[in-house]
């Protein structure tokens, strides 16, 4: 990673095997790695505030690595063989927008969330998604969904179907 600027870059350490893409360089979006990529983007933005320059890449040092390319499996047992590369300008450009939207959402919840209602939901984001397991919140979701006749209770109707219904003035399956 070369540039004309002298600056710091983020290298995070994870005690896990790095799942690399077929190029053997960039990290796959598997398991927790989407979250790790977002985490490193936030670290990179914080670093940018300090040094006035945003590095285009961040790295993860894992305990080992592996990837599959052209019918062959490759792997290494040393954490120093390869770093997992996160490229915010090319391969992982979507991470930048995802983090930006997540930060906007957190700020919106902090500033306006106290005014919202879940019974009935006052925003589309507050409707339950019955197609997803939410652990300990499943009973609460089910209660709300039953009360409002949520569209995602219908077999094969997810959030996209609910959004289509909302656009056509349909708020319930009843």
Question: At which residue positions do the language-model features occur?
Answer:
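Mixed-charge, glycine-rich, non-catalytic linkers/tails in nucleic-acid processing enzymes
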Residues: 57-62, 93-155, 159
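Mg2+/Mn2+-dependent nuclease catalytic core
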Residues: 1-99
């Amino acid at each position: 990673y070369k540039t004309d600027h002298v600056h710091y870059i983020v290298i995070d350490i994870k005690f896990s095997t790095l799942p690399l893409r077929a190029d053997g360089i960039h990290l796959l979006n598997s398991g927790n790695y989407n979250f790790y990529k977002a985490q490193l983007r936030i670290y990179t933005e914080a670093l940018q505030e300090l040094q006035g320059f945003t590095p285009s890449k961040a790295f993860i040092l894992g305990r080992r690595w592996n990837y599959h390319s052209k019918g062959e499996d490759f792997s290494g047992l040393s954490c120093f063989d390869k770093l997992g590369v996160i490229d915010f300008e090319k391969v992982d450009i979507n991470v930048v927008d995802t983090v930006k939207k997540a930060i906007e959402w957190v700020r919106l919840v902090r500033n306006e969330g106290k005014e919202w209602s879940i019974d009935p939901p006052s925003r589309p984001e507050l409707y339950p998604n019955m197609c997803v397991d939410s652990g300990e919140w499943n009973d609460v979701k089910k209660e709300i969904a039953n009360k409002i006749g949520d569209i995602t209770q219908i077999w094969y109707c997810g959030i996209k179907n609910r959004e289509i219904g909302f656009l056509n003035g349909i708020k319930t399956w009843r």
